[in-house]
Amino acid sequence: LLSDSNKYIRYVGGLIGFVIVIAVILSQSRAGIMSIAFICFILLNMKFFHKRWVKYLSLLCFALLLSGCYWMKKDSADGRLLIWRCSVSMVKDAPWLGHGIGSFEARYMDYQADYFRQYGLNRYSMLADNVKHPFNEYLGVLLNFGFVGLLMILALITLLIYCYKKHPCAEKRIAFYSLISIGVFSFFSYTFTYPFTWIVTFLCIIILTKEYIAKVFTCPIIKNTVCI
């Protein structure tokens, strides 16, 4: 009976996953498509890790998909390239600690104007706009908190990978892949402007670190503090 129940859960989960994939493709969300493709790339390499041709074929397909996503909405992609170029110039002016929270919205237009003063009117000139986010969460961290902030994010990622490898299980694998998907999506969009993303990320972190969280709360000092 338990086996039948688990099989039913797998079927339902597979059906929901299939519906989500179709919905993402139909929505033409390039960041979503790349996230799904990256997870598929990881799963294929885990299943056929001993076959080198699978790795090369997966890399080729991923590169073709990336190129296809660019040409799908070329003007939009070029607009983001302009935003990233101007954002990199902002990072160069305050690389270690960043410009502070809200700096992109406050100062981006100045850097965009400087870019066109330096390079003149080019293919990006028709795509220039007043934007409120760099369309890349990692670039956003660099702008707000500099390399110090980015190093803290990388330290957290390293810690989560360690926690996953130390106590691997199906539940943690799902949480880990969910975070990878969010991480890939964050390269191309403003993922963390939505509360839902924060909630999912927080839950995944709890799942990955639950053994260590349990140790913290079973520590005598913490227990006595809570009791007080």
Walk through the language-model features, giving the residues of each.
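Alpha-helical transmembrane segments of multi-pass inner-membrane proteins
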Residues: 1-51, 55-70, 143, 147-166, ...
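Flexible juxtamembrane loops connecting transmembrane helices in multi-pass membrane enzymes
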Residues: 39-43, 56-95, 106, 125-129
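Phosphate/oxyanion-binding loops and surfaces in catalytic or ligand/nucleic-acid-binding neighborhoods
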Residues: 44, 90, 94-97, 107, ...
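Alpha-helical membrane-protein architecture signal
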Residues: 84, 97, 131-139, 177-180
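Interfacial juxtamembrane loops and adjacent helix segments
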Residues: 101-143
